[in-house]
Amino acid sequence: DYDMQDVLDDYLNYCYTDGLIPVSDAWKYMRMQLAGTTFDFNISSSVYYDNAERGFRAHDILGLYKNKSVRAIGKVIARITAVETENGVKYNTEFGELTDERKEVIAKAMDDGDSHGYDLRTIEHRYFFVEKFDETDFKKVTPRAPMGTRIFDLTQILGSNDIPSTDQLAEMLKNETWT
């Protein structure tokens, strides 16, 4: 089941990257990421990072999972890859704007990664910047943590095509659960 989901996610990433799916429906998707160790850094810096080789489905909302629940959500406003080279850090802006402030956050993420044994320096990572993370409690009601990324169609969860602001969405998700 998880292997098939990975194959489907990779295929969707390929389709979006190569323009085979011309209209993005990212507005209705939330990507949930496991963030136990780095959760506090993610919240305080309004960023989440992941290995750049990992594909992903287009999404506007990013959720951070910790302790059996999505604990925070944020609207993605920039997506930037970065890796250290002998000539300094090489950045690639996929979406949004590369600012000096975002470069500083990436440098701090690399330092934070070092403290947890993660190699964010020599392995290219993708940085998802959000406006801010809003606290929520979108509980997983089945045993065991998820095996990795999970995509949620917010229109199905909310029963509406109207996706509210991130702070309102965070409040609404507190009344929902998932398996």
Labelled PLM ranges:
Residues D1-T136, P143-F152, Q156-T179:
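Charged, terminal alpha-helix-loop-beta segments
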